Structure formats: structure tokens, C-alpha cells
From Swiss-Prot:
The keyword Iron applies. Belongs to the polypeptide deformylase family. Keywords: Hydrolase, Iron, Metal-binding, Protein biosynthesis. GO terms for molecular function: metal ion binding; peptide deformylase activity. InterPro entries: Peptide_deformylase (IPR023635), Peptide_deformylase_sf (IPR036821). Its EC number is 3.5.1.88. It holds the Pfam family Pep_deformylase. GO terms for biological process: co-translational protein modification; translation. The active site is at E135. It comes from Pseudomonas syringae pv. tomato (strain ATCC BAA-871 / DC3000). Its cofactor is Fe(2+). PANTHER family: PEPTIDE DEFORMYLASE. This is Peptide deformylase 1.
Length: 168
């Protein structure tokens, strides 16, 4: 396993549209393992392949405190099940140090393939629904900051650009 480099906003590669996985093979399973290791090390609760500069439709998540509930979503498709919205303060490994309120549908259904390429379906509410939507947004080149006002997004962008220059 390996720790992968996480791209940070405003890196343009985060805007790349991820391509579907044609076949779940050992290479995809290795990517999944590396993504989990990277996510846990960061630490975070979700990671999309786009964030590690692999533009395939792969997401890993684990909402548990003790790394006991790893979830894999390959080629996920989301269906909104309600018009009711929840507001959560979201953060992102690609937007480090920033947390903002985002409104998202309260309940969704996701269809995906698991680590072995087997199809499954899951109805999600609460934090799980929020995380699934957040991570799947990455696969479509979208970040949680895109839900914010231009003013807030530009402020975050400038602060991160300044931080990147200091770290260079």
C-alpha cells in the first residue's frame, strides 16, 4: 500500500471529470487500498480518486471512529429520494482547514460496485448521505466550495494559494 498525494484547491486537476471503471481488477483494488491508507493517514472520512489525481469513478469512505466500516463505491450513481435538504458543515481533504455550511438532499439512493466488482444499492440519510454526495461531486469535478458565494470561495482560494507559496 502507498500514501498518495492529495491535490488541493485550486488545482485544476480537481475539475477533471472521472471516467467509469471498465473492469474491477487488481489495479483497481490496489487503488482502493492506497486510497484507504491515504484517507486514514490524512485523516479523513472520505476520498475520491480524483483527489489523488486518478480520474476514475472510485470513492472510499469510513464514517467510523475506529476504521471499522470501510465502504467502497465504484462507478457510483446517486438518486435523490427527497426534496428535503440538510445543512452540514463540510470540510475536505482538498480544501484543508476550511469548513462551510452546505445544503444537500437529506436522503439518497446510491448504486455502485464494491471492491470485488459486485453491484449493490444503498439508501443513505444523514452524514452518510452528505458524504456520498460530497465524494461523488469530486468525480464530476465539483468541490464543496462551489456551493458557496463567490466571495467566500475566492477568500478560501486566496488563503490556500498563499499557503501553497509559503510551503513551496
Amino acid at each position: 500500500m502507498a500514501i498518495l498525494n492529495i491535490l488541493e484547491f485550486p488545482d485544476s486537476r480537481l475539475r477533471t471529470l472521472a471516467k467509469p471503471v471498465a473492469m474491477v481488477d487488481d489495479g483497481i483494488r490496489q487503488l482502493v487500498d492506497d486510497m484507504f491508507e491515504t484517507m486514514y493517514e490524512a485523516p479523513g472520512i472520505g476520498l475520491a480518486a480524483t483527489q489523488v489525481n486518478v480520474h476514475k469513478r472510485v470513492v472510499v469512505m469510513d464514517l467510523s471512529e475506529d476504521r471499522s466500516a470501510p465502504m467502497v463505491f465504484i462507478n457510483p450513481e446517486i438518486e435523490k429520494l427527497t426534496d428535503e435538504m440538510d445543512q452540514y458543515q463540510e470540510g475536505c481533504l482538498s480544501v484543508p482547514g476550511f469548513y462551510e455550511n452546505v445544503d444537500r438532499p437529506q436522503k439518497v439512493r446510491v448504486k455502485a460496485l464494491d471492491r470485488d466488482g459486485k453491484p449493490y444499492e444503498l439508501v443513505a440519510e444523514g452524514l452518510l448521505a452528505i458524504c456520498i454526495q460530497h465524494e461523488c461531486d469530486h468525480l464530476n469535478g465539483k468541490l464543496f466550495v462551489d456551493y458557496l458565494s463567490n466571495l467566500k470561495r475566492d477568500r478560501i482560494k486566496k488563503k490556500l494559494e498563499k499557503q501553497h507559496k509559503l510551503n513551496a
